[in-house]
Amino acid sequence: MSVEAYGPSSQTLTFLDTEETELLGADTQGSEYDFTDFTLPSQTQTQGHTQSQLDNQLNGPDDGLHNGGMDDSVAKASQLLAELNFEEDEEDTYYTKDLPVHACRSYCGIHDPACVVYCNTSKKWFCNGRGNTSGSHIVNHLVRAKCKEVTLHKDGPLGETVLECYNCGCRNVFLLGFIPAKADSVVVLLCRQPCASQSSLKDINWDSSQWQPLIQDRCFLSWLVKIPSEQEQLRARQITAQQINKLEELWKDNPCATLEDLEKPGVDEEPQHVLLRYEDAYQYQNIFGPLVKLEADYDKKLKESQTQDNITVRWDLGLNKKRIAYFTLPKTDSDMRLMQGDEICLRYKGDLAPLWKGIGHVIKVPDSYGDEIAIELRTSVGAPVEIPHNYQVDFVWKSTSFDRMQSALKTFAVDETSVSGYIYHKLLGHEVEDVTIKCQLPKRFTANGLPDLNHSQVYAVKTVLQRPLSLIQGPPGTGKTVTSATIVYHLSRQGNGPVLVCAPSNIAVDQLTEKIDKTGLKVVRLCAKSREAIESPVSFLALHNQISNMDSMPELQKLQQLKDETGELSSADEKRYRALKRTAERELLMNADVIWCTCVRAGDPRLAKMQFRSILIDESTQATEPKCIGPVELGAKQLILGEITASWSCVMCKKAAKAGLSQSLFERLVVLGIRPIRLQVQYRMHPALSAFPSNIFYEGSLQNGVTAGDRIKKGFDFQWPQPEKPMFFYVTQGQEEIASSGTSYLNRTEAANVEKITTRLLKAGAKPDQIGIITPYEGQRSYLVQYMQFSGSLHTKLYQVEIASVDAFQGREKDFIILSCVRANEHQGIGFLNDPRRLNVALTRAKYGVIIVGNPKALSKQPLWNNLLNNYKEQKVLVEGPLNNLRESLMQFSKPRKLVNTINPRFMSTAMYDAREALIPGSAYDRSNTGGRPSNMYFQTHDQIGMIGAAASHLAALNIPIPFNLVMPPMPPPSYQGQTNGPAAGRGAMKGKSGRGGRQRIQWFWEPGGWSHAKQSDQPGWGFPVILSGATDTGLHLHEPAFPDEPARTLPARALPWDSYLGDEFKSQIDVALSQDSTYQGERAYQHGGVTGLSQY
């Protein structure tokens, strides 16, 4: 076995036998462990004439004008200029024809053998220069193309070498690094894990602490691959990051594509962007339908490309007698996230048994305690359970969720019974008069079995019950789940049929279901068949489990028992079993008080013939708009959208996200002027922990429902730098590294410090399940899991703390939170940490204490983090040094910029360059006269380069980019609200939705005597008395004035979470806009280009 090393000559890579000790003493480096000086003179090839030669040709010798005369000189200069122009015309030909094979021809054209690297997967050469991008061209390509193996050029300083680990042969360049060894004359390439961390390295005199990655700051180390000089890069073809992104996308379908192909028509065609207002539901469907298809196509392509070979399987038998396969997948660079219930195809490809294939669904996903995945097979007939090796895993793509979204969009457009007229027009952005539902309000708003409500929660419940459309905003720890459950309780008690409650995720559904079950209502949890075997706290409420316990259908129970024991039924029994099961499902659903499901599950055929008057969608900002339409089109006449302020929807397809699919329905309605009701009292955080989030994200409106004394943990002995403030920022100087996937980051120094802090917390009395470690990067999460298990000083079981991403911690809490920031670089920015929503989530998860571990120098360049660091420094909790002797850091930061809001100076800037602001031309969010598109860096996508870093310069340099849905934004200026009453300006009268030939379908409706069915032509009415805007009999005015000091409110000002406006120029206009009256004359009638009235909503 030989090791790659620098031999006596610095011109070649020498392979040395480890036994030849006489060669190991050669000193080839001038400085200790410093290989950055190892560079060679570039083998520069002239590109055309040099500037000096051209100058000489144009000007001629000094005496040219005297000897040849003026005319001859001019003629000669003209001829040379013509030749020069001809050379410019041929510039593109130079890049395509005259470049050698090893040139970075796809990008810039640089072809110095010392500067280029060969991608073994794509079979293309790329240089190590940055050009106009934040990383080198080779690293840009490796990340975007998801490649990992490279070869150096044969004429380069190290010869033709495939970079690989000396110990295990790993060729993933994102894992590879080097260790100086044996008297500094040899460098050994080793992978980060596990080889570089093995203790056996000390036996051969290799110091693992000196391990450094081959790629730093998104460039290969200069001693390994030369970085082209600035002059060379200026002479090369200039290619932008945007062109690189488009070209890489094009290569997925056409590997031979060139930059010239980007100019062809149709290559970069963008879908139609979402609108703020829609003329009708047909336009709505025509815009969102293609975006849903884009997302579906991307998701399908992503899943079908995830095949993994050479998988080792561990077989087991479940309690239900079904086979379970356990296996671990290699670390992938995919955006795809495996979820419980996903389908996987497992194949045996070996020679020891017949070929076999089985389908199963995921019942266990990787977590903080291990990376093992478990699937439960539908049938295990023929499965080679005795053989552990040679398996292949395929991800099964199912179009169900996308099909249901498309179906919901179509139903919303063509079926008049799908939603009330009022909600229909409100969702489309039409100008309609606000209405109030006249209902019997409860004398006591607190629901049975739930905690008492505070003033803002009572106000929220009271207001929601009287409105057909409401938005609820719940900052962290303010009890939004309890408030939502209370609202559902009172809606169900009104006797208007079951209430449908949905959320984007199963976790959110389960949390809310658990609360409402305590009230004693009849609750049914509807879930996918693939999730029926997955345990949750509310499994007993699931429809399939309730059917199993129905005493009224003994025949069904017998058939179910027989099927569980034998695995299958005869044809006749199976037919009878399905019929009985459908009857039981229908009976349970129709007798339920509340039905719970995910937004996509609302399109389940079992709900197809039911309609729901009251629908609540929780955490609606986590769902795209088409997902929300699924529940809404089931007959919504009263719609409540709940929102956790730090949430966001995830759209994988970049094109769809840029077109606005990532914008939620909640956000668009806020932009349209529907004011959310905000809860104000938080019960989670120590007051010291809530101060910064309250002031920055919630305009100081959060009130503390707990005292500092309530948040002193008994039996916990931990020395905080400031005892009355259980928080600190631990200064760490480590450098970030690209993770093995190439699309994420890790920071080994931070990981070591996080382990030390965790150990101190455990020794101080905290339990593992009371500690949460948050990091924005999957690379750091995975590295921390392994580091804690193998390098922790305590028993491994004590390190079973939850380590997860910011997204995974949404809506949850821990006693103590440790935040690992990861980012530490000179050129790349701070990536995910730019997103204030993620910072808000991270800072608001803890009850008793928060510890941030990061590099202040890198973070302080971003305005929001600069504010945070200055805040911590002022409070003397910015510390450094050993944990047992922390001292205040002396680091200085620039003075934080003043936070300014152009409409409402009382609040901070709400500028975030995203779809929702760009939709309002001329508003505070529009930074151009043309309503230009926002910066791509703020679209919520999972683009790989976006994960690694964003451009350092953007329009938000003067403001902190707080997202729209983080704060309660000012209402759009009335001058925009009233521009000819909506999108039909200048078009005359609009056609209403009535009479548009919808399809007929049998539907079930709730009447006082119970469920009945009718066709859409004889659909019963709303059943609730409706009054126009004005004072209700309860004394609550629906149209509150814009200023809390005005006398129209009957509740105390502190109980009203609506924000005030200080802009006098908008006061009178807003009051007028909020008090317009009209007469309702028809179902969905329009008049003078706007909606004038609705008799049924």
From Swiss-Prot:
Region (C3H): 104-137
Segments of this protein annotated with the region C4: 165-195
Pfam families to which the protein is assigned, alphabetical: AAA_11, AAA_12, UPF1_1B_dom, UPF1_Zn_bind
Family membership: Belongs to the DNA2/NAM7 helicase family.
Positions with a binding annotation for Zn(2+) 1: C104, C108, C127, H137
InterPro entries for the chain: DNA2/NAM7-like, DNA2/NAM7-like_C, DNA2/NAM7_AAA_11, P-loop_NTPase, SF1_C_Upf1, UPF1_1B_dom, UPF1_CH/ZBD
First-listed, main subcellular location of the protein, grouped into a coarse class: cytoplasm
Protein name: Putative regulator of nonsense transcripts 1
PROSITE patterns xrefs: UPF1_CH_RICH
UniProt: ATP binding residues: Q457, G474, P475, P476, G477, T478, G479, K480, T481, Y683, E813
Sorted UniProt keywords: ATP-binding, Cytoplasm, Helicase, Hydrolase, Metal-binding, Nonsense-mediated mRNA decay, Nucleotide-binding, RNA-binding, Zinc, Zinc-finger
Source organism, top-level taxon: Eukaryota
GO molecular function, one term: zinc ion binding
Keyword set includes Iron-sulfur: no
A GO biological-process term: nuclear-transcribed mRNA catabolic process, nonsense-mediated decay
